[in-house]
Each structure stands twice: as structure tokens, then as C-alpha cells.
């Protein structure tokens, strides 16, 4: 299963921008991809360490329950479209 997880934090404008970029990118693809946003406060200390979420927004791409991409910061939607094409062939 293909999945994108956006880890955010309260008051993060970059997180809002990345959320919009991901939503727009998902509208440009016909691939079946689950999209989830998580606030960092929902994660345990162990999850934060395992996912290496030290800065925000952190975008994680999963394919078959394995992380295939970890990106920090904001990107335009067209870059996210490219990531989808590369990671979810």
C-alpha cells in the first residue's frame, strides 16, 4: 500500500503549505495513495526517534509499510508529483 504521512506541529505555516502541496499533487495522479497528517504531539518519543522527526514539516512516503522517502521542509506541488511518480511506480 502507498501512503504519505505529513508530520506537523502547531502553528507551523510551512506545514500548512506542504499540506496544500500534497493535496494538490494527489489531485494530479490516478495512483491509489493514502494520505495522513499527524501532529508531532500524537507521536510517542520512540516514534519520533524512529521516524527521525526533528524538524517540521516532515513528509514520509511509505511503500508496503517501508519508508521510501523522508523530506523536511516545504516543496511546490509539482515536486511532490515527481516524488509520487518516482516512489510509487
Please place each PLM-identified region on the residue numbering.
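Thiol-based oxidoreductase modules, predominantly thioredoxin-like and allied folds used
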Residues: 7-9, 19, 31-45
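Structured loop/turn residues at beta-strand edges in well-structured enzyme cores
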Residues: 31, 54, 66
Amino acid at each position: 500500500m502507498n501512503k504519505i504521512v505529513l508530520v506537523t506541529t502547531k502553528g507551523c505555516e510551512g506545514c500548512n503549505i506542504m499540506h496544500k502541496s500534497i493535496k494538490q499533487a494527489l489531485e494530479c495522479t490516478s495512483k491509489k495513495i493514502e494520505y495522513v497528517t499527524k501532529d508531532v504531539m500524537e507521536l510517542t518519543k520512540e516514534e519520533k526517534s524512529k521516524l527521525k522527526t526533528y524538524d517540521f514539516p516532515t513528509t514520509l512516503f511509505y511503500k508496503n509499510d517501508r519508508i521510501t522517502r523522508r523530506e523536511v521542509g516545504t516543496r511546490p506541488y509539482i515536486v511532490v508529483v515527481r516524488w509520487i511518480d518516482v516512489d510509487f511506480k
